[in-house]
Amino acid sequence: MTQPTPARRLDEFKPDAHFAWCVTGSGHMIEESIDLALRLPRCDLFLSSAGEEVLPLYGWPMKRLREHFKVFRDNSASSVPVGMLYNGDYHTVVIAPATSNTVAKCALGISDTLPTNLFAQAGKQCVPGIVFACDTAPSVITQTPHEWVEVRPRAIEFDNVERLARIEHTTVAYTLDDLRAALDRRLTQLTLAWNTSSS
């Protein structure tokens, strides 16, 4: 078995490199996730088609998103934005929140959406990835656009999360606090700090 390749050195990224924050079709903690993205220095959004459909239901239509972020949409079969990873434009890929579908694809090496393609290419470039998996507890209380509901993930969802956590250069966040802590550690590594305001 080969030894894992070390993470990409910080001096291999551009001085003004960004976070690449991917949004999938989950509403679980989506508002809290976007709030964290707003507080990061230099953060761009990458939306799956489902993510683009879901965000307006939680108060984030495209117009509002573009007031705060540079936004990339999943409308290109070639996923052209992925090439920016190779140029050192992005030092970290975040998927938050990540649906069970996205987690399964990432865990199995399937890259047929903008977020999953970014994740796969980041791994091949030894760029750290942080994935906030939604289905990580026997019972998950989550907010839909109209009400709170209980979701009971299946064994296969737990298996996929465990499989994902074993992939090189990947940190799986099981809770919002885990996500915040993983971002905090990455900011420290990059000698960056949270923005004091998310407005």
Language model regions located:
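A cross-family phosphate/adenosyl-ligand binding-site feature
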Residues: 2-199
